[in-house]
């Protein structure tokens, strides 16, 4: 195996480590995290880049927040996991800055820019809005090159936090980029919130940052045996895994496309009220969240467009983080996400109202978010491998990631606003520019809720199903 790696490796020699760099060992995580996360936020005020940079510099000099300015380096480790360290300079200089920040000034309006105008913007906040964002998914409007995955970061001497600010006559777009190996969306949201605290002069509200070397899963995995994990007998392996992979390859032949959907808060509230009314006929005190209802409603729309065989199993994974189990006084930035699994026959999902699926989603979250289940899941993963796959060979896999707790649409940059507008200076729209390549299941992200209570989602689905989904959303708009 080492001989094969020698002749097939394209790795470059990493840059020399600074003689006084402190080395922080990152926890091992699955290779799926070796990608970047790239997000574009649109503000309807012009922002002062100097104020944003100065407050960011100040944050990255505080305690373990400094580790965000470290350089990724690969270390020899188990090939099934990402083995990286952070090499943190003893001081940040012009040659080795804590972050990358580029600014572009344009005399044009945002909607006059050939790429910026493609960013979704709510035109009628009372309707379900549907955006084809294919042309807007260009991850940069100014950057010529940046590392695309963790290994490329390790071959550079670049800091992992990158920002591009595009100031227009009537607003600002900020492009945020970081390697996923460092943080999940909620962790990045905690970083952004700390940044706004510094910008707003609320230094006492900046939380202590948990160092990246502290493995959250190691804190938990030794307390409950692996056999206690609810799905420990549902590991997909061997021939069954091969069958599932072949089916997934076939279903990806036509390719996938991404769309953004903005759903009015009033529609989701009304749908939730109806869901609770339905459930109250069989439960004393039913509860489902707005997110449960949003996912259940749209997954049923997706199933109607895909029209899968009813005997197949829908495996709906819902990402949740485990920070609620950790001491609240510190900010835990590192990846802390687990998946709650809802497994149901497709026929049962489509023949029942959305309240049925919403209730099942909530049940899976309640069941798998307990401290005992998370501990058992950590112990089980230690036994079976760092990236197990649960389900059946015939399953229709649909992954959902909820970024709403990251609060990206609550980011208030008011003190940096050059042009003042009523209310807080928060993003008016959001776009996930992360590049998903290769074979993927059906995948959706709840990006968050905006200041007008609209829910933003971004879905990557089979190309052929989008026309039917758009017709269904148009029908809903006409009947409301």
From Swiss-Prot:
GO biological process: terpenoid biosynthetic process
UniProt keyword Cell inner membrane, yes or no: no
Record pathway: Secondary metabolite biosynthesis; terpenoid biosynthesis
EC number, UniProt record: 2.3.1.-
GO molecular function: acyltransferase activity, transferring groups other than amino-acyl groups
Keywords: Acyltransferase, Transferase
Keyword Acyltransferase: yes
Record-annotated active site: 180 (proton acceptor), 412 (proton acceptor)
Null allele phenotype: Leads to complete loss of production of austin.
Assembly, per entry: Monomer.
Family: Belongs to the plant acyltransferase family.
Name of the protein this chain belongs to: O-acyltransferase ausP
Native organism: Aspergillus calidoustus
Gene label: ausP
